[in-house]
Amino acid sequence: MTTKEYFDYIVEQIHSTVVATVDEDGLPVTCVIDMMYADDNGLYFLTAKGKNFYRRLKDKGYLALSGKKGEDTMNCTAVSVRGKVREIGQDMLPLLFEKNPYMLEIYPTEESRKALTVFQIYEGSGEWFDLSKKPIERDSFTFGGAENKASGYFVTDSCIACGSCLTDCPQSCIELNGKAVIRQENCLHCGNLSLIHI
């Protein structure tokens, strides 16, 4: 999937996400925030200027969010995004209200919307995790010019192709073709292989 497709999934399939910010003491604070719109430039949501959430966004300019869709653990997909945010003001409010008409029940008049403002998550990275597939499926993505940092586990040149890693992998995502190769798109990142030093 493309980054835009992940964003669309967040907005259309998950919508209400758990967002983490940091308070003035450096402690984490979470709240549930609806992701209301996505385009090629990021994710968009709104908040009111009187909220502590607004102050944390303005103070730190960064957030992390997670959301999941599914009835239970083995039938769910989850997406996490972390990145820089910026306030873009009220210009997009009409679009966000058009795309999310339930907001008219919360803020029914123009006057009641005076304190609302839109934020954009414009640069960062994310992860996709799908436990409904066998083996599991995972992916990572970046947007807004963020650097793509390699994560997970990789086989080193010290691998002697003994095959001992094959039984330790809970998702059977290791292939032995000369030396072991981990299929990153199916890896749980459990750490089992780091214990056998491949």
What are the roles of these predicted feature ranges?
Residues 15-49, 55-57, 63-69, 76-81:
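Short beta-strand segments
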Residues 52-125:
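Short, structured beta-strand-loop surface elements
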Residues 164, 192:
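A short, cysteine/histidine-rich metal-binding "knuckle" motif
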Residues 1-18:
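Extreme N-terminal tail/first-helix region
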Residues 196-198:
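Conserved small/polar residues in nucleotide/adenosyl-binding loops
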Residues 143-161, 172-189:
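Ferredoxin-like iron-sulfur electron-transfer modules
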